[in-house]
Every structure is written in structure tokens, then in C-alpha cells.
């Protein structure tokens, strides 16, 4: 992990977004920075960061109610889901419901939370600071931990199969060569950051209006503001505001606005931040006394299958390049293996792209959709039912098809009838 820059903004936005999303109000003190174009702000974001720590405030206004999964799942529904799980995952569904993990995930996406983040080249630690408790995720080169202080449960997984330095160098070299080959086809000089920024702006500009907003302060730091406004008429997204640290180029704050409401639907941003490298001890964890310890272990059948695949790969491809025909053969093999599973398709592109599923995955019991609590989340529309939020809609048609996207309900209905 030579460059933290490649994943630091994703940690502050993506990790925390899969964990929720947000921003903080702009601070009143005036900021006077040199004027930059959108391309120049993007170049600023290419700077390398080796470590940081800070407190993120996460809020979202999605209109999601509090859900208690245990009250939504009958014993028969749980049993049905168990039977459909792969061998070795028999206890997965009961444990998930007993620990209320799904409820916690939904609750984390909605509402407001404070999240403490530590990151460096040797690890990452995320602490969700609840009112009466705390949840931690710790990742280093050797292991991963999650800790729920409220329920006194710790879960760990070891990273046993490490990539050797030689293999890592080869992977990086192959990736760089592939990228350079692709760039050559585009007639793009990837050694020229300005050229890359211009190319990205040209691509983005086909679907999005991008501009630079007011200079301001976030977490005590001066920042530029990139504003993206979709050109698509059927998008639920009105605009996205990204605050970029004027010195480090790190994304400090993100706001996502919906056409459905005035307040941001998603906000994720730093309340405080330091770019000093956190102490390595923060990326280790010892469960407190009295903690229930769980170890994530791969089911024996799956582990054996992966071991077989590894041997096949080493025997077949270790001494030669993988060709397109090799990929085609593997694709055909996987398609045959999962032929009975509904396959997602992408309809359209850009801000109006829609994911289509010909059926609800068989692992989801249909009785769950008829549960009173779950049914309250669905709105009846001509041709089906819709689960709606300010930034995404999911249409389940009367015939069992599923359409989902960050688009209006009317647009989903149009796509469904094409």
C-alpha cells in the first residue's frame, strides 16, 4: 500500500457510506484561495497522503423507519432461508437475526452518527460512536476485527494467504502495463496529469455539469468545492457537492441532494481531522474480558473448492499469459454453474442507468415481502410495488421482475414496459 491517496477518500466516503453518508455545515470564517478550474481541483486530489485521523459526522435523510428484523422473520421463513444457503452456512441466517446485524446496518445508513477514523499504510480503524455504546472495525496486514461493545461480541478473521513481495511486484507491473495499453488506445498520455484530468472532465461533461463553488472551511481547513449536476432529466440526484482540502487534496465533505427534498439526502464530512500518522498500536485489538469471541472461518467445502481452483490456476496459467479464450471458457463454466440464478442486467447508462433482475433471488422468502412491517415500506403503483427513498427507487413488478436505480418511479415504470 504505497499510496493512501487512492483509498483515503473512499474510507471517508465509501467505507463510511456503506456505513452511512454526510457533511457538516460550512464554517463562517472567510477563505481566500487561488482560483482553480474543476480540472485543477481534480489534480489537487491526486496528491499522496500517508496517514490521517479524524471524527466524521454522518447523517442521512432517507425516510427509513427503524426496523427490527427478528419481528419480521417467522421461524418458517428463517428455516426456508437456511435450507437455501450453501453448505457450511447453516447458522449464518439465525446468527444474523439473533445479533440484529441487518437492523444495525439499516440504522447505521439512516439517521445521524459520529465515526472516528484512523488510517495509515499499516492499517485502518473505524469506531462508530453510539450514544450508549461503540462499534469498532480494525484491519491490519494480518487480521480483521469487529467489536460490538453493547452486545460484548468480537469477530475476527485471519489473513493467512499473504501475497509475496515478488507476486505483488508482478501484479502491480501487469496492472500498469494493462492500464498503459488501454491509455494508448485512447491516445491518452497517462504520465501527464493535466491530460488525464482533461480527459476525465470530457467524459464526465457528457452527462454532468461540473463547476467550482465557494471556497470555505471544513474541520478548520480551507477547502475548494466541486459541484456536479446531472444533465439527465429522470435522475433523482439533483447535485453532489464535494469539499476538497486545499493543501492535501483529500475529500473532506460530501453532500448529495435529491430532487425530492431541500435538505441533503446524504451527508458525510469531517468534524475534525489531523494528517499526523496514527500510532500503529491503534490497528491491533485485544477483546476485553467477558467478550464473546467469534471466528470467521471458511466452510470446509468452499475452502476445498478454492484450493482446487488455485491448483488448476497454477498448473494451467503459471507459465503463460491468460488469453481471452481462457476468460471465455471460465465465463461459460460459471454461467452454467449458476444458470438457475437470476442474472442482473444494466439498462441505460450514466445517471439514468437501471439495474434489472428477472426475479427476486430465491434465497429471499416471498412471505417476507408480505410481512406487515415490510409491506409498509412498499407503495402500490400501476404494475407493481415500489420501495422508495429520495436517492433510489426499487420497482417490484406484479410479474416478479425487479428494477432499481437512482431514477424517478415514472422512469422505472417506463423501463419496465419497454
Which residue ranges define each predicted feature?
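Single conserved position on a long alpha-helix in the C-terminal lobe of the eukaryotic protein kinase
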Residues: 129-154, 162, 238-242
Amino acid at each position: 500500500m504505497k499510496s493512501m491517496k487512492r483509498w483515503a477518500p473512499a474510507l471517508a466516503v465509501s467505507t463510511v457510506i456503506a456505513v452511512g453518508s454526510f457533511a457538516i455545515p460550512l464554517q463562517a470564517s472567510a477563505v481566500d484561495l487561488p482560483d482553480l478550474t474543476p480540472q485543477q481541483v481534480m489534480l489537487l486530489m491526486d496528491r499522496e497522503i500517508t496517514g490521517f485521523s479524524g471524527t466524521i459526522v454522518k447523517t442521512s435523510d432517507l425516510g427509513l423507519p427503524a426496523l427490527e428484523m427478528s419481528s419480521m422473520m417467522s421461524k418458517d421463513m428463517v428455516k426456508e432461508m437456511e435450507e437455501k444457503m450453501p453448505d457450511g452456512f447453516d447458522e449464518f441466517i439465525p446468527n444474523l437475526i439473533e445479533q440484529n446485524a441487518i437492523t444495525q446496518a439499516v440504522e447505521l445508513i439512516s439517521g445521524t452518527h459520529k465515526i472516528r477514523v484512523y488510517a495509515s499504510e499499516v492499517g485502518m480503524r473505524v469506531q462508530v460512536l453510539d450514544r450508549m455504546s461503540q462499534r469498532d472495525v480494525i484491519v491490519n496486514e494480518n487480521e480483521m476485527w469487529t467489536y460490538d461493545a453493547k452486545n460484548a461480541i468480537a469477530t475476527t478473521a485471519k489473513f493467512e494467504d499473504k501475497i509475496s513481495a515478488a507476486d505483488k511486484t508482478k501484479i502491480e507491473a501487469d496492472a500498469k502495463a494493462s492500464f498503459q495499453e488501454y491509455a494508448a488506445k485512447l491516445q491518452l498520455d497517462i504520465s501527464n496529469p493535466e491530460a488525464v484530468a482533461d480527459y476525465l472532465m470530457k467524459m464526465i461533461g457528457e452527462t454532468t455539469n461540473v463547476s467550482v463553488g465557494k471556497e470555505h472551511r471544513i474541520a478548520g481547513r480551507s477547502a475548494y468545492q466541486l459541484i456536479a449536476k446531472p444533465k439527465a432529466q429522470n435522475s433523482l440526484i439533483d447535485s453532489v457537492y464535494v469539499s476538497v482540502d486545499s493543501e492535501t487534496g483529500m475529500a473532506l465533505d460530501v453532500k448529495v441532494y435529491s430532487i425530492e427534498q431541500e435538505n441533503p439526502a446524504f451527508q458525510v464530512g469531517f468534524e475534525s481531522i489531523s494528517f499526523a500518522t496514527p500510532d500503529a498500536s491503534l490497528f491491533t485489538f485485544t477483546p476485553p474480558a467477558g467478550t464473546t469471541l467469534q471466528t470467521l472461518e471458511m466452510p470446509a467445502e468452499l475452502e476445498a473448492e478454492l484450493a482446487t481452483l488455485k491448483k488448476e490456476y497454477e498448473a494451467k496459467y503459471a507459465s503463460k499469459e491468460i488469453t481471452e479464450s481462457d476468460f471465455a471458457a471460465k465465463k461459460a463454466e460459471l454461467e452454467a454453474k449458476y444458470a438457475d440464478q437470476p442474472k442482473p442486467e444494466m439498462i441505460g447508462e450514466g445517471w439514468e442507468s437501471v439495474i434489472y433482475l428477472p426475479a427476486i433471488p430465491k434465497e429471499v422468502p416471498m412471505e417476507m415481502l408480505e410481512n406487515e412491517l415490510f409491506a409498509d415500506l412498499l407503495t402500490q403503483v400501476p404494475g407493481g410495488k415500489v420501495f422508495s427513498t429520495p436517492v433510489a427507487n426499487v420497482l417490484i413488478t406484479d410479474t416478479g421482475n425487479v428494477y432499481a436505480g437512482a431514477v424517478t418511479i415514472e422512469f422505472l415504470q417506463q423501463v419496465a414496459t419497454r
